[in-house]
Amino acid sequence: MDKIRERAFNIYEEWLENVNGELKEELLKLKDDEEEIIDRFYKDLEFGTGGLRGKIGVGSNRMNIYTVARATQGYANYLKKQKDFPSVVIAYDTRKNSELFAKTASMVLAANDINVFLFDQVAPTPLLSFAVRKLKTDGGIVITASHNPPEYNGYKVYTSDGTQAVPKYANEITAEIEKLNYFKDSKIIPFEEALKNEKISLLSEEIFNDYLDEIEGYLRGLNALMDIKPIIVYTPLYGAALKLVTGILSRLGFEVFLVEEQSKPDSNFSTLKVPNPEEKSAFELALKKAKEVKAGLVLATDPDGDRIGIYENYNGEYITFTGNQVGVMLTHFLLCKFREYSSLKVGDYIVKTIVTTDMVKPIAEEFGVTVEETLTGFKYIGEKIEKYKNSGRRFIFGFEESYGYLANDHARDKDAIIAAALISIMASEMLSKRKTLSEYLKDLKEKYGYYGEKLISFEFEGFEGAQKINRIMNKMRKNPPVKIGEYDLLETLDYLKGIEEFPKSDVVELRYSKIKLIGRPSGTEPKIKFYILVDGSTEDEAQQLIKEAESAISEIVNV
């Protein structure tokens, strides 16, 4: 601890000598707060496979113009080793300092003689992935902290195929970043100068319309029954997906009512506890609006437009679905559509993460397609799609339990815009068949099995929290529960040692005959996450298995 304290105070002094303006004032206010100085300076904000993610503020362990500039200089050095004249697209969401950080990154890249395409307005993450592919750039950056609380921001890097950087590339970029001093090594030129010299070009409406044209063509090709369309209430949760979600739903002929209070950018997310469509609280105003207009479907996207949550009006009561349930319905719906209109072929495939429901496996088997699995994180799904793109195997659908979905070939990251359209089209087809989504899901369970899932997270902040998370993971590896309920432990999979073709990762999977229990530290938050996956013969049995797994988790975290 003494070495950590010494390092933190040495770096604090270095920052005091070099920063100015508001950040200098913020530093001076910390001078008597040892705990805060240690938390802000005990390490560098890590550039992991999620890029940078952290609280906004001064410090080496915070998101600010210095950490952004250093990361971007490292990224520039990496790119210039790959290619002589690289180019990069940069997008940003509605969070505090997102535009500032995007401009900082663009000025650093421009100073390194890298051509930058910078969005002239907020843009969702899937549009960034699309733009990288459309403009054939060598990479992309999006400034976002997704659905984290308002005090956070982040910085994600994309490779030339529009996929978020997987560990191989992230590690190479990290190696370049770690060579750099925060204050001496980052090149930068003024924004206006870079615009004048055409090192920075601004992207405007055309790329939005190109995206809408692309996904509209795909969606109309599904030839879904849309005789009856639900009235839709939509909230972007103050985020960047508003223009594209309303744009595609309008093109498809849906009547959409907005939650006006949440439709203008607000970096404080004022009416929300957290801007996360996985949370019931995020739907409070949307459900109020839905009752007023008698909406059949309620949609919410997160601030960077890559995740979506839904509610359905079921006999006058609004009920929600998990990310797994929506993924199962969309999988079955799309497979039906592909079989109906374009004949499925051997080798066609669905992609999901290891922590996502196994219910799609019997569905895929019936349709004669393959289920490919990846580690947690949509970047691995994007990587898998890219791997098979020239193999003759057709990508049908990819999803993860955390409310992220992708269909079509336009992007390589989860896309709440195309998902919003697909969910609305699927709901329309069900209505045209005199069915609700709830009834559709019930039919699927009766046919394919009563699978159940639950995510349980524990938050442990700061240095002490990181140590606690390490102890919990060690316990899962070395001393896991030998029984859950009446079921013996069959197998322990430690992905850190390397499992099959999966890259090494700090993930442990415990397999029991009807239960899977998977633990991993979050890559973007100070949390450890446990995923319970069960396969019951009835709904009641599935719920009982989940309860027994929860008891086992309580035992594991008690270290």
Predicted stretch roles:
Residues 14-15, 19, 36-45, 155-282, ...:
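Gly/Ser/Thr-enriched, mixed-charge loops and adjacent short helices
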Residues 89-152, 250-251, 255-310:
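N-terminal small/polar loop signature for handling phosphorylated ligands or for N-terminal nucleophile
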Residues 3-105, 112, 194-230, 240:
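An N-terminal, well-structured beta->alpha segment
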Residues 41-61, 145-146, 232, 236-244, ...:
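Conserved phosphate/anionic-ligand binding catalytic regions in large, soluble enzymes, centered on
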Residues 127-185, 303, 314:
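Active-site phosphate-binding/coordination module
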Residues 291, 296-297, 337-520, 527-531, ...:
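Phosphate-binding and adjacent anionic-ligand microenvironments
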